Amino acid sequence: MTLREITICGLYGYIDKHIKFHHDINLLVGINGSGKTSVLNIIGWMLNPASLPHLCITQFSKISLKITYKSVNYELVCQQTGKRMTYDIVREGAKRKSYHPLGILLLPFPEGFVERPDFKKAALERYSGLKPNENELKTYTFLQQIPKPFILGLDRTVTRESKDPRQNAPMSAVEQIQEIANTNYSR
């Protein structure tokens, strides 16, 4: 599976993002509060039907995630309009829809919902029992089968530990990636 492009409109009521992905490594860089973590979360939520509750409690107007899976291009489109959220899978170039859209009735949230972790937790629990109906089963199953991306968070304050005090210095992003790859994926 390859991520090709993501467009997010109206995230939290004021953030719009459009990112075209490269075929190899992609880095998201920005100041605090610019939406880096939100973009990564949304990508994960869009590709995992078990994470639909997170999309239900996140304010946005439209999310479009373009992917290639098994050599076929798809556009995953999630929209919130009023009291409904719909999630469509569109096979690019198809003359008719291959997948029935997922439809979710959105619950009203109290004022200050975003700032209250207890409200968010309760809302997630209310949506946790979401199950596809008979028409939505093919869509839900497709989403379960899509491989999930590997997201590697890098913190610029990471240091390498060494017995030599001269080597206890901050690591660059490239050094962090090499360290993680060598530690976790070497045989």
Where are the model-predicted features located?
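Primarily extracytoplasmic ectodomains and periplasmic/lumenal surface modules that are beta-strand-rich
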Residues: 15, 71-73, 159
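Extracellular structured ligand-interaction cores
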Residues: 3, 60-62, 147-149
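Catalytic micro-motifs at enzyme active sites that drive phosphoryl/nucleotidyl and oxygen chemistry
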Residues: 51-53, 75-76, 135-142
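Short beta->alpha connector loops
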Residues: 11-12, 45-47, 132-135
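Electropositive, glycine-dotted interaction segments
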Residues: 84-187
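Phosphate-binding glycine-rich loops of NTP-binding sites
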Residues: 22-74, 80-82, 87-94
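N-terminal pre-Walker A segment at the start of P-loop NTPase domains
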Residues: 1-15
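Conserved A-loop
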Residues: 17-21
